[in-house]
């Protein structure tokens, strides 16, 4: 019961944010179109700043001190490759392919991860989780942009796709973060404070906007795709990944990090990117909402079993 409450306490705030969005739309305080337009603020401003901040303050040297992070990076790449191979097999609509690929391989590790890690390990023992997120952010960002650009509605050349990947707002933020980190640049307070404040807005604002634009009828319409992605995202991918790390001899904090990186619900940025890149944002928003709800169950099951066998 304690583990169920722990998982619920992590996910519940995200669900409350979405409920606020639903109420804002239902009461007519904010129009659905305004909420869709407001996603551009997240896509072009707050989300890139959140990525920048995560990388700018990360201990990059520590990334290479343990083989765990190397295996984690390989796991992310393999998951993306398998998702890119699998999704086109059952989905023929380019407008949905990029969204489904992101749904399978990209987890909500930055928003969901630190909260879960702090609850399981304690506030003072989440160093590895922070470093893992700083490594996963650029990896997830690169492959997410590639997937979305690859299946964008218009026909474009490889060079055009590559240029869009390089100049994507999230990627530019990652470059800036690495630049500031490697050169040990300390921004003046007058710049750092607004960056921190805007980055902190990302999570609540993103989920409020998601709640205001999600269509509950879309759950029924996209039932097959949602079921497939939910099973893969919350159960199959983390089961395989965590099992692999256990076989490699990892225990404790490393297993918690692996569970979060590979088992968190669909990343909120999937919806934001779908809106910004003219993909199926209705499907993307529904995937984020449904997997966020069912992650309460999946995280409870994984945490319970791992604790029973003293793996964490």
Regions found by a protein language model. Name each.
Residues 1-312:
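Alpha-helical transmembrane segments of multi-pass small-molecule/ion transporters
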